[in-house]
A protein has these predicted regions:
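N-terminal targeting signals for export/organelle localization
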Residues: 1-36, 142-144
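Structural signal for short hydrophobic segments within the conserved structured cores
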Residues: 26-28, 88-90, 122-124
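A short beta-strand-turn-helix
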Residues: 30-56
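Conserved helix-turn-beta segment immediately C-terminal to the redox Cys motif
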Residues: 53-56, 71-92
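Short pre-active-site segment immediately N-terminal to redox-active cysteine/selenocysteine motifs
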Residues: 54-57, 61-65, 108
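Conserved redox-active cysteine motifs that mediate thiol-disulfide chemistry
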Residues: 61-75
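Glycine-rich active-site/cofactor-binding loop and its immediate structural neighborhood
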Residues: 89-106
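Non-catalytic, surface beta->alpha helical segment in thiol-disulfide oxidoreductase systems
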Residues: 108, 113-144
């Protein structure tokens, strides 16, 4: 995985955060039920990764109280707009979706799951600068 991994949080607090402007491309909050239908149904196929999406994706496992999560939130919003229809960026609030976070062994946030159309997803932990996100998107997700 490309890029320097900077900082992350571990622990607990509260919350939710994800409003943006207009109807331009933006990050999408997911519940466990939505994850099972849009990303991967790990309950039906616990031993095999089967991506259900129609474009590469990033899943940001975050919490609203986490400083590094707050740092990358606007970066992810910018990337969602910049890459438009090429990728989708999902967000999973680890405070409200504890079972989903547990299924992926999330112990440190932010944790980012990079999901290419083919092959296995890759997990990265900690905040990254925008340039590192772009490098990972281009190499891992878009094969540029």
């Amino acid at each position: 995985m490309a890029g320097a991994l900077l900082s992350s949080c571990s622990g607990q607090k509260d919350g939710n955060n994800n409003n943006k402007k207009e109807t331009t491309m933006k990050t999408i909050n997911l519940t466990k039920e939505e994850f099972l239908t849009k990303v991967a149904n790990f309950e039906a196929s616990p031993n095999e990764w089967k991506y259900l999406g129609d474009k590469p994706a990033i899943v940001d496992f975050y919490a609203s109280w986490c400083g590094p999560c707050k740092t990358i939130a606007p970066i992810l919003e910018e990337l969602a707009q910049e890459y438009g229809d090429s990728i989708v960026i999902y967000k999973v609030d680890t405070e409200t979706e504890e079972e989903l976070a547990g299924a992926f062994g999330i112990r440190s946030i932010p944790s980012l799951l990079f999901i290419p159309m083919n092959g296995q997803p890759q997990m990265a932990q900690g905040a990254m600068p925008k340039a590192s996100f772009k490098e990972a998107i281009d190499k891992v997700l878009l094969n540029k």
